[in-house]
Amino acid sequence: AIVTDIDETLIDNSPYAVQQSLKGQDYEQPSWEQWTAKADGDTLAGAKTFLDYASSKGVKIFYLTNRKESERAGTLANIQKYHFPDATNEHLILKTAESSKEGRRQKISETYEIALLLGDNLADFSSVFDKKSIETRNSNVSQQAAEFGKRFIILPNTSYGDWESAAYHYQYNTTPAEKEAIIKRILKKAN
C-alpha cells in the first residue's frame, strides 16, 4: 500500500492561504473548514498520475490526513472530484483524538504492507518526528536517511508544518511578531 498525506501533497490549498493573507489573518479552523467543505482544492502536478500508476500495479492507496471528521464529506468530494484511486470512506483516514499519524499507520499495516509514504511533513513518515525539537528532528532525519527517496517521499512545504512549530517549541499561542523574530533568527542565509 501507499499511504499519502493530502494537503500540499495531493491537494493545493494555496487559494485558502491567499484568502487568509488578503484578510490579514493566519490559519484558523472555522475558515479552514469552510474552505475544505467547498472541495475546491486543485491537484498538485503529478499526484494523480503517480497514484493511478501505482493503482494500476495493484497497489492500494490510503489517504491519511489530520483533517477532522467534520471535514470528511468535503475531503472525500475533493479527492473524488479528480478521480484519485481508492477514494472511498474506507481509504480516507482522518484525524483521531491525537494528531500523531502513527496509530493510524499501524492500523493500515495490520492488513497491508506499507511500501511507500508520501507527505510534506516529517510526521507523515514516522512518530520519531512527532513534536520534537529542531535538533532532534535533524538527528532523526540523519538516522532515517536511507528511507528518504525509497520509502519516504517528502514534498517540500515552505509555507507551514512541524518545522515551523518546532522553531517556537510547539507553543501555539506564540504571537505572529514572536514567530517572525524566531524564524528570522534561525533562517539559513546564502553565502
Briefly describe each language-model feature range:
Residues 1-99:
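Alpha-helical substrate-recognition element adjacent to the catalytic core
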Residues 68, 72-191:
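C-terminal cap/substrate-recognition subdomain and adjoining C-terminal extension
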